[in-house]
Amino acid sequence: MGGEVSNKTWVFKKSPSSLPEPGVHTAFEDRPLSLVAPPGGLVIKLLTAGLDPHQRDRMRGAGNVDYVPGYEVNEPITNFSIAKVIRSDNDVFEEGSLIAGSLPIAEYGIIPRELIDARAMASPLVWKVSNDYNLDVKHYVGTLGLAGMTAWNSFYGLVKAVKGETIWVNAASSSVGEVVVQLAKIEGMKVIASVSSDDKLDYVVNELGADVGFNYRKEPVGKALKPAIENMKWFGRIISCGTASQYNKPVEEQYGVTNLSEIFRRRIKIQGFIFWDDNIYTDNIENFKATMPKWVSEGKIKSRYTQFEGIEQADKAFLSMFTGGSHGKTVLKISDP
């Protein structure tokens, strides 16, 4: 069964030097799509797209060599999303099943066999979602998707929590931070949480259970990394999953750390990571899949979403992450399941 459908698509047009401008750096285009699955591949209908600050980093363009490829001019903007399979020529993904992973942000998409088979280090780029607990699908781009896997794999793979230790979670109300706060409390840690507003402070302390928190826009602590280094105990660990506050700044204006000598004095370890790294993904992902959906269904793990509806809201949703207009995970609902 074939046919062709109109297909509104969010397209990358030009690399920005600061905040992206809708209509200049991104655009919406109708890219009609044939409803015929390619050999071994799929046709999908997008349900909910996740939006993340790291997409701004990818807007440096295809020539940018980084942990994920830069976006190509005049190609769809992709990110971690969930979709429904509407045509299939693949034994694993039957029609009607749910698929999550790195997908084009459009009303419909073609998933070739090559993408189904591809991997980014230890992780596949797309995978089947069972949704055994009948959860809202937005969780699979948030707490049960990229944000949750980032939090889980780094917490259990790198933090290596010890009961009674203290952890400072910066951007604690973010989609990753909120999960880390709750995992730390489950493992018996004392949690200090820093956020950018009083509303977020109330959330992380009174709903997520952080022991103490502060609004860094009101407290004279400076940039988080410098005071963290200055106050860290010997053999402390700093885990970095991104630098969202710096993505819209040219290199010469980005934040510099002036107390690096404290790293050797205090024997501090600083570790960057991506959730799919072999050293943390393989040993932790199965526990994540077995545990987190149940915890979310039981309310043991809470999460907050800022949801925008309609693909036409993609620019507004994306920019909200850099202007303080989103809480928790930013998602774009494109269609119903």
Curated annotation (Swiss-Prot):
Q: What Pfam family is a match, any one?
A: ADH_N_2
Keyword Oxidoreductase listed? The answer is: yes
Q: What class of enzyme is it?
A: oxidoreductase
Q: Which InterPro entries match?
A: ADH_N_2 (IPR041694), GroES-like_sf (IPR011032), MDR_fam (IPR045010), NAD(P)-bd_dom_sf (IPR036291), PKS_ER (IPR020843)
Q: Does the keyword NAD apply?
A: no
Q: Which UniProt keywords apply?
A: Oxidoreductase
Please summarize what the entry says happens upon disruption of the gene: Impairs the production of fusaric acid, but leads to the accumulation of trans-2-hexenal.
Pathway linked to the protein: Mycotoxin biosynthesis
| Biotechnology remark | Fusaric acid is phytotoxic to plants such as cotton and banana. It has been shown to induce programmed cell death in plants. In addition to a mild toxicity to animals, fusaric acid exhibits acanthamoebicidal, antioomycete, and antimycobacterial activities.
**Enzyme Commission number, as recorded:** 1.-.-.-
Matching PANTHER family, A to Z? Answer: PROSTAGLANDIN REDUCTASE, PROSTAGLANDIN REDUCTASE 1
What is the purpose of this protein? Dehydrogenase; part of the gene cluster that mediates the biosynthesis of fusaric acid, a mycotoxin with low to moderate toxicity to animals and humans, but with high phytotoxic properties. L-aspartate is suggested as fusaric acid amino acid precursor that is activated and further processed to O-acetyl-L-homoserine by cluster enzymes aspartate kinase FUB3 and homoserine O-acetyltransferase FUB5, as well as enzymes of the primary metabolism.
Q: Record's family?
A: Belongs to the zinc-containing alcohol dehydrogenase family. Quinone oxidoreductase subfamily.
The molecule here is called: Dehydrogenase FUB6
Which source organism does the UniProt entry give?
Gibberella fujikuroi (strain CBS 195.34 / IMI 58289 / NRRL A-6831)
What is the gene called? FUB6
